[in-house]
Regions:
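Residue-level signal for the short linker/turn that defines the boundary of a DNA-recognition helix
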Residues: 14, 24-25, 51-54
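A short, Lys/Arg-rich alpha-helix, primarily the initiator
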Residues: 1-22
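Residues within the helices of the helix-turn-helix
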Residues: 17-18, 28, 57
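Short alpha-helical DNA-recognition segment
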Residues: 23-42
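Hydrophobic micro-packing sites on short alpha-helices
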Residues: 55-63
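Interdomain hinge/linker segments and adjacent boundary elements that couple functional modules
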Residues: 50, 62-72
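The alpha-helix within a helix-turn-helix
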Residues: 20, 31, 60
Length: 72
């Protein structure tokens, strides 16, 4: 299944990792900014864990993403 949940999680995780990298943050720094453990950021970025929309918004805020199209 090319568009199953696991594939979508990995794609979202890769996009979030790229945004974090563009913000010049390590996963540990990003985790501290949002009050999580680094392992949670890592699990989200690898697609090993699902992510709630509210958590995505927290990360986007931490990464300074203001583009409304990226935030959808």
């Amino acid at each position: 299944m090319q568009n199953g949940p696991a594939v979508r999680r990995r794609k979202l995780g890769a996009e979030l990792r790229a945004l974090r990298t563009s913000a010049a943050l390590t996963s540990g720094e990003a985790a501290r900014l949002v009050g999580w453990h680094q392992s949670k950021v890592s699990r989200i970025e690898t697609g090993a864990s699902g992510v709630k929309p509210a958590d995505v918004r927290l990360l986007l805020d931490a990464y300074g993403v203001a583009d409304s199209q990226l935030r959808e």
